[in-house]
Amino acid sequence: MNLVNFKSALKTLKRGLPIIFTTDTLPAIGCLPKFSEVIYEFKKRDKNKPLILMGSEHKQLIDYVHESAIEDFESIASKYWPGALTMVIPSSEKETEILTSTDNTLGLRIPNSYMAQSLMLLTGPLLTSSANISGFNGATTSEGIALDFPSLSILGPIPWEKSSGKASTIIAWKK
């Protein structure tokens, strides 16, 4: 297992590689937004399936939200984040280069996880997905994930904080 600390995780991300880390729901694979292709490659994921942009606090994500949805975004974020809720919301026109969907929306989330929030305070928002090979149930422990992704760095310390083991609830913004 390639266990890394926060400083090494940041170096890995800046080199364009994804890392594995825990969240409040399922373990995540994440990368800096400009390197989104690597998640699709490692997961063997269909490129038509969007990724989720995670941050440490909603202020990190607000620039990614279209102006027509900011009021609703703020209201929902203040009520349900941090937590196991992913908001699919119209994306800002200035941030379209990170879009992984075809309908100009972006999934946004702030996990209720000290480790994940601490990581993203350091790195900024990360594009993420659950840490599994697409189409297969993923492991929920660092040891199991290391078997699926032996070449990827896993953020420590181990054992990870307790998570729910269930995917986040997804809500879509409608005008």
Where are these regions (language model features)?
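Active-site-adjacent structural elements in enzyme catalytic cores
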Residues: 1-175
